[in-house]
Every structure is written in C-alpha cells, then in structure tokens.
Amino acid sequence: MYKILRLIQENQQITSHDDLENVLNGLNNLIGHEFFLFGLSFQPTLKTSETLVTDNYPNSWRQQYDESGFMHIDPIVKYSITNFLPIRWDDAKRVNNDGRVIFEEARCNGLKAGFSIPIHGLRGEFGMISFATSDTKSYDLNQQSIHTSQLIVPLLAHNIGNITRYHKDAKPRAVLTAREVQCLAWAAEGKSAWEIATIINTSERTVKFHFSNACKKLGATNRYQAITKAILGGYINPYL
C-alpha cells in the first residue's frame, strides 16, 4: 500500500508524456503484470473524436487491432463507455461472439489474461487502463491487484486535461487570450456583440475582433462553432 501511495504522491501533476508512462510503468510493476495500456477518447468537436494511447503492448497486436477495427466491437471499450467498475477479461469474453474473437486473437499475441478499469473525465472523455500478462500458469488475478490499480484512477482522471495536451500524439492546443474567452463565454449566454461590449466596457468592434481571433485559433467558421469548441476544449466551463 505504501508504494502505490508514494507513486500517487510523486505524480500529482502529469505534465509530460514521460510522466504518464512513469505512472503506468510504476503501477504495472507494483501489481506484477507484463503489459499495460491507457487509452483515452475525447471530442474536440461534436462530430469528431480523437483517441490517445500509451502502452507497452506487443506491436503485432496493436497493428492487428487497429487494422481490423477491433475498437468498434471491443467489449471492453463498450463496457468502459457506461461503467466505472473494473472488469476481468474472463468476464468480458462471455459478452458476445465478437468479444471471444478479440480475446482469442489477443491470446495469440501474448495477452492471455488481464483486467481493465474505465476512466471518465468531466467533459465527457472516457477511456480505460488495462493490465495483462502472457503467463497464465503462474497468473493469479487477486482482488488486491484490482483494488491497488483503482487507486490510480482519480489521479489519471484529474490529469485528463494535461494528458490530452501533453500526450505524444496530441494535436497542438490553441491558446486563447482572457478577453477571447470572456467574449465566448458571454456569447454562450446568448449575448450579442453589442451587449458583450457594454458588459466588458469596450467597443462592439473590439468584441468582434476577439471573436474573429478566437475563431481562427479554434479552427471555427463562426462564433457558434467557436463556442462549442471552447466548451468541449475546456476553455469555457459551463458549470461555473
């Protein structure tokens, strides 16, 4: 217990991809598994999604998984969308025939046993952390391994924003000024450019200038799309 608590304490802020790998490797070693995978899916827009993966899975399996489109029928992925509790792979195999096929192919690539834990963010992000082994003869999946792994989930969930920003495969994040964010936030409340100008004590022309800059930075064609992207990207927090 001391080791996992120390791992969490030393990695409160994940500010690089190396930090993320260190946490995953550390936990993987603590629970005595060979392989780990952290996958995270999020929506930069309402119609598009991005997936970030950090793992040490065999390259042969990752290539087959991606080329075969297994993510769309993977029972672990489907489970993680709407659940929070861990799931053993042995239990997931029984879900449907697609699941049995995927796990059989995984076994052929050295991933013979394991478990996964769903992870959810505040803005609809979802993902999972999985641990696996190729040695089923001496593999004893006890509840302690699962419980230990669950302790890391709040840390990963807390750092989802940093992970999407600093992951090795992440796209560059737009940097908005305080005024641009302020204008978008008021626009999200239904205020016109003239009303926003009155509220923040500036000219309507200046407000439109901020809208134009925000749209360019966010890759939006108009202020309404910019508002959507700003909310999904965490620039505007609708809960505050």
Curated annotation (Swiss-Prot):
One Gene Ontology term of the molecular function aspect: DNA binding
Keywords recorded for this protein, A-Z: Activator, DNA-binding, Quorum sensing, Transcription, Transcription regulation
DNA-binding region location: 193-212
SMART domains per the UniProt record, alphabetical: HTH_LUXR
Database matches in CDD domains: LuxR_C_like
GO BP terms: lactone biosynthetic process; quorum sensing; regulation of DNA-templated transcription
One Pfam family, short name: GerE
UniProt keyword Methyltransferase, yes or no: no
Domain HTH luxR-type residue range list: 169-234
PANTHER family (alphabetical): DNA-BINDING TRANSCRIPTIONAL ACTIVATOR DEVR_DOSR
Family under the similarity heading: Belongs to the autoinducer-regulated transcriptional regulatory protein family.
The protein's role, per its UniProt record: Probable transcriptional activator. Binds to autoinducer molecule ODHL.
Protein name, entry field: Transcriptional activator protein VanR
Organism field: Vibrio anguillarum (Listonella anguillarum)
Top-level taxonomy: Bacteria, Pseudomonadati, Pseudomonadota, Gammaproteobacteria, Vibrionales
